[in-house]
A protein has these predicted regions:
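Bacterial Sec-dependent N-terminal signal peptides
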Residues: 1-21
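Substrate-recognition/specificity elements adjacent to catalytic centers across diverse enzyme folds
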Residues: 22-208
Length: 208
């Protein structure tokens, strides 16, 4: 098993955390198949370590998601990103997050803060991998803006907007009733100690 000890400094100026994270107390242990297991004294530190491990595996993908969620995708990929930027403005993601942020549980906000600190620390450690400097430092609100866009698209509302813009929306509009999921994982029996095949699904969204 590969054991990685995080010996990092928390980003100083520019990050006002809800809770202090001690990176020295965080361990990321990867199993034989590379799956990261995070060990730390607090949930917030686990969130920090989780963010770091995720960034190790796909920092580019994480950035692209938050770039889109914060309305700057066209600055990254050009005109192809204009649609996502339009949707972010259309749903008023920033305004919604600012207005509702105070309703969130402080413990949840602390987890978001730990996660963002982990990503920011990784970005500072690997500056050449940063796609858009404008995205950093990440904050809990920036994460939540992406969530607004994600939920909007996951529920198919972007298709409604497209229909309205192109004047192609028929009435009455029928919503698709089929259930969808994502991250469907099939694990071969050759990779399990019990010699069994497993099928796991992470839907992200409610099935009802």
């Amino acid at each position: 098993m590969k054991k990685i000890a995080l010996l990092l400094l928390i980003l100083g100026a520019g990050i006002k955390g809800y809770t202090q994270v001690n990176p020295d107390s965080i361990e990321i242990i990867r199993g034989p198949y590379g799956v990261p297991h995070i060990y730390a004294a607090t949930d917030v530190e686990v969130a920090y370590g989780f963010a770091w491990a995720q960034a190790e595996d796909h920092f580019k993908l994480i950035q692209e998601a938050y770039i889109a969620g914060n309305g700057i995708l066209s600055k990254h990929i050009g005109l192809k990103g204009a649609g996502a930027d339009f949707l972010v403005q259309f749903i008023q993601a920033e305004k919604t997050v600012d207005a509702q942020f105070h309703t969130l549980d402080k413990k949840f906000i602390a987890l978001l803060e730990g996660f963002t600190q982990g990503l920011n620390a990784f970005a500072k450690k690997h500056p050449k991998e940063i796609l858009k400097n404008e995205l950093f430092p990440l904050t809990p609100k920036k994460l939540l803006r992406y969530t607004q866009l994600q939920l909007f698209i996951s529920n198919g509302a972007d298709k409604l907007v497209k229909g309205i813009v192109n004047n192609e929306l028929s009435w009455p509009y029928e919503i698709e009733q089929d259930t969808k999921g994502s991250n469907l994982l099939a694990i071969s029996r050759s990779r399990t100690q019990s010699d069994e095949t497993f099928l796991a699904i992470n839907t992200h969204q409610p099935l009802e």
